Amino acid sequence: MDVCVRLALWLLWGLLLHQGQSLSHSHSEKATGTSSGANSEESTAAEFCRIDKPLCHSEDEKLSFEAVRNIHKLMDDDANGDVDVEESDEFLREDLNYHDPTVKHSTFHGEDKLISVEDLWKAWKSSEVYNWTVDEVVQWLITYVELPQYEETFRKLQLSGHAMPRLAVTNTTMTGTVLKMTDRSHRQKLQLKALDTVLFGPPLLTRHNHLKDFMLVVSIVIGVGGCWFAYIQNRYSKEHMKKMMKDLEGLHRAEQSLHDLQERLHKAQEEHRTVEVEKVHLEKKLRDEINLAKQEAQRLKELREGTENERSRQKYAEEELEQVREALRKAEKELESHSSWYAPEALQKWLQLTHEVEVQYYNIKKQNAEKQLLVAKEGAEKIKKKRNTLFGTFHVAHSSSLDDVDHKILTAKQALSEVTAALRERLHRWQQIEILCGFQIVNNPGIHSLVAALNIDPSWMGSTRPNPAHFIMTDDVDDMDEEIVSPLSMQSPSLQSSVRQRLTEPQHGLGSQRDLTHSDSESSLHMSDRQRVAPKPPQMSRAADEALNAMTSNGSHRLIEGVHPGSLVEKLPDSPALAKKALLALNHGLDKAHSLMELSPSAPPGGSPHLDSSRSHSPSSPDPDTPSPVGDSRALQASRNTRIPHLAGKKAVAEEDNGSIGEETDSSPGRKKFPLKIFKKPLKK
């Protein structure tokens, strides 16, 4: 018990002793601090009066100067009285947390690399913040410091710009007691913002806030408008390019159609050549058949002449007559298949000249279309090359080259379609003209030969333009359409031979279309009737006169012995109208011959004296022993007109032989009459 009491007393005594020592130590420190504070205040007042004597008696200015001096002391690490560049840079990076203090550093130092307390005070007095009013300080507190809750406190204390340095230093009395800031973060934030404002002046955001906002809004509007404009232009450019590509594809299709038409022309040329070869073979075959028929007729004639039996002679004559009828039937069918009208030769030359002049104008139009096509292609290639560049799309969209190329493509497409349509229409039109006229117009000797043949002044025609060789077409379309298949070459060789003979004999006119009468009283044509008939060539009139003179009262003996049907076939005129007329007359004569043969069965084989006398006095009935001049002239004409020289002589000899087949034909009694109704079919018009 005593031990515990002693221990407690000893501890109490120790505590009292320790407290006494601490109190004595604190009193000594307070005395020392008071004495040092008094000394520092005296030194600060003396320095302030030395630097700024007019303001040294103001207590607020003294407090502000003391705050500026403390700021300078914070920045002066080596305590040499001056703040150099390194010290200020370190202070900005470490204390103010500026990562790029270049602008602030240049603003703080300027041209002076060493900043003293006096320099710092003069810079503060010359600052705009030094002259701030209470309202400006409150505005700075709200906008820059962002502490609007202390606005009333600042207004009550009437803190102006002179008190700003006191806010920039760590002063618990000022911030805690006077401003009543209990939050440490608010005190630190206010200190840093005030320090930045004192050292570097008013913040730029407070002065240029509205301007920057306006510039930002304008920039955003311009950017959005530019993006929208670029989008619209890009879409318009794409649509325009699509349209141009469609037009270009249409131009390619028109060009392809022109190529297809050109290939069709090539095929037509090949078919034309094939038809020409087949036509020559067909002509040769027909000539061979005609020669065989003539040989058979000659054989029957020889058999008839060497037979003494009257029935055998009559039988041979009937067989020969049947062959003649068959030949006449074929000739009639060929004549019925052709038109009865033929244009004159001069019309053919004028139409050929018209075709050549039209070809010249077509070539000019085609050359213009080719030039437009090349220009459009070059423009399209340039547009494609520009699109491959970096700003090619925008350049093409803003320039007028796209519209120009589009217009050129449409113009070239229209011109090419017009040229194609003109080519088709011209080929069809001249084919129809050839069909109606019956001669060839596209295939002609050329414009120079036609001008010379028609005696036209060459200066009227002008100079022909050469065809372009740089175009995509391989051959000249106009040279090909001159070799287009003519409808005349598809027809029978007899028509072509007749057309050829008509071209070589331009003096042949149209024959009379008057039908021959079938009456027995009209044995011969009177002079007045012959004057009413249209003028005929000598060969045509001779053949027609023979057919008409053969139909007399004793026409059976005249037909069989005087004028043989085989010879009349050779003597038929070239004009289809006169040939039909002669065939009808010959057909009617054959019917009358059979009728007279039945009426006079007792006639002698050699014929009556009246028949011989009439034969000798008739100018149209040549003597059997004398060759017919009509046959000779016909043979010479055929030899001149035929295109195959070695067949011309054979044709002439065959015609002379065929002309003498029926000269010795005699009639016999009791023979049946052959119905020849097939020769009386109506003519096709």
Swiss-Prot record:
Reported effect, F108D: Constitutive localization in punctae at the cell membrane and constitutive activation of CRAC channels
Ranges of biased composition (kind: Basic and acidic residues): 515-532
Result of changing D475A: Decreases fast Ca(2+)-dependent inactivation of ORAI3 channels
Effect on the protein upon substituting H109N: In TAM1; myoblasts with the mutation have significantly increased clustering of STIM1, regardless of calcium levels, indicating that calcium sensing in the sarcoplasmic reticulum is impaired
UniProt effect for mutating G81D: In TAM1; increases store-operated Ca(2+) influx
Topology relative to the membrane: Single-pass type I membrane protein
Compositionally biased spans, kind Low complexity: 490-499, 608-620
Keyword Ion transport carried by entry: yes
Composition skew (Acidic residues), residue ranges: 655-666
The protein's name in its UniProt record: Stromal interaction molecule 1
Lineage of the species this protein comes from: Eukaryota, Metazoa, Chordata, Craniata, Vertebrata
Gene: STIM1
